[in-house]
């Protein structure tokens, strides 16, 4: 992926995350639940002071430091490995975008705005940036697993 396309994609993904959070705060009261696709997905507005599943509540500096380290390393890795396959680039793009999206919330608000609730399973409420991070990490693990299988 060309550097310009990567940066534009990064900006677009972070903007989408931030716009979704702005919309939720503007249209749904804190703690309110609104069905989006009945029985499948609801939207709610939750202020998360921790990480996934609300672990490590009120440890904002920990998350800031970890986020800076992970994003910094991912950017360093991209810069020092210019010939990565498209799947690894996409994985790192998603990880960086998700990290930045939640980082903005932590710096601006001291919490992360979560809003997506899966009605059909007992699962934590999450946001768009969390989705990027999850898909990015899974994709990166698949890439690394495939490399190991093929001895690359």
Curated annotation (Swiss-Prot):
InterPro entries: Peptidase_A8. Disulfide bonds: none annotated. One of its GO terms (molecular function) is aspartic-type endopeptidase activity. The chain crosses the membrane at residues 5-25, 61-81, 84-104, 125-145. Its EC number is 3.4.23.36. Keywords: Aspartyl protease, Cell membrane, Hydrolase, Membrane, Protease, Transmembrane, Transmembrane helix. It is a multi-pass membrane protein. It catalyses: Release of signal peptides from bacterial membrane prolipoproteins. Hydrolyzes -Xaa-Yaa-Zaa-|-(S,diacylglyceryl)Cys-, in which Xaa is hydrophobic (preferably Leu), and Yaa (Ala or Ser) and Zaa (Gly or Ala) have small, neutral side chains. GO terms for biological process: proteolysis. It is found in: Cell membrane. Belongs to the peptidase A8 family. This protein specifically catalyzes the removal of signal peptides from prolipoproteins. This is Lipoprotein signal peptidase. The lineage of its organism: Bacteria, Bacillati, Bacillota, Bacilli, Lactobacillales.
């Amino acid at each position: 992926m060309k550097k310009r396309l990567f940066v534009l994609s990064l900006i677009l993904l972070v903007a989408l995350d931030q716009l979704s959070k702005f919309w939720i705060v503007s249209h749904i009261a804190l703690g309110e639940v609104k069905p989006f696709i009945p029985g499948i997905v609801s939207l709610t507005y939750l202020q998360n002071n921790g990480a996934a599943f609300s672990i490590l509540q009120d440890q904002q500096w920990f998350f800031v430091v970890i986020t800076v380290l992970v994003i910094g390393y991912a950017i360093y890795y991209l810069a020092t490995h210019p010939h990565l396959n498209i799947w690894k680039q996409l994985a790192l793009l998603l990880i960086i975008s998700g990290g930045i999206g939640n980082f903005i919330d932590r710096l601006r608000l001291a919490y992360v705005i979560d809003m997506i609730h899966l009605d059909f399973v007992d699962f934590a409420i999450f946001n768009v940036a969390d989705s990027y991070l999850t898909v990015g990490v899974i994709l990166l693990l698949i890439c690394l697993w495939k490399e190991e299988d093929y001895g690359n």
